[in-house]
Amino acid sequence: IASRLIRELEKPIAAPSANKSGKLSCTSPGDEFAKLKNSIDALLNGGDAELGLESTVVDCSVEKPCILRLGNITREEISNCLDYDIAPISQLEKKIKSPGQLLKHYSPDAKLLLNQNKPNRGDIFLSFGPHPKEIDGLTLTESKNLEEAAKNLFTFLHILDRLSKAKGGIP
C-alpha cells in the first residue's frame, strides 16, 4: 500500500515511525488510530500486520554490519541474503543506536508478570498454549505455534491494556 501511495502521489514523501517510544507497537489499524486519533487527520488502512512482530533492524553504517534489534527476519536469513555472516545483536556495538535496544521499549501500560503458573484473583492471564477455562485470559496460540503467537502478541497486549484500564488497574 505504501509503495502504491508513493507512486501515485508523484512527490517525495517522508514519514517517521508511528510508534511512540515506550508505548506498545500497533499491529492493527484500529489500535493505531486509537493511539494517534488526536494527532492525525487520516489513516491509510492496509489491514492488520501480517507478522505482528517488530521489524529486524540492521546497522549497515559500520564496517561489519550488525543486528540492532531482532525481529521476524532472522540473523541466518540476513546472512544468507548478504552472503556474509552478520554479527548478532550487541556483539560489536555497546552504544544504543536503535530505540529497540532500550531497556523499556514498546511497553504496555498494564502491569505484566512473566512466567506465572496461576494468576492472582482479578488478574488477566495471557498464555502460550491452553489455560484453565476458569481463568480470565487470552491465549496467544492454542497449538503453541510460534508464528501464530507472534502475530497475536501486540494485539493481545493492547487488549490487556484496555481490560486493565476497564478494571481500574492502571493509575
What are these regions (language model features)?
Residues 1-171:
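Active-site-adjacent structural elements in enzyme catalytic cores
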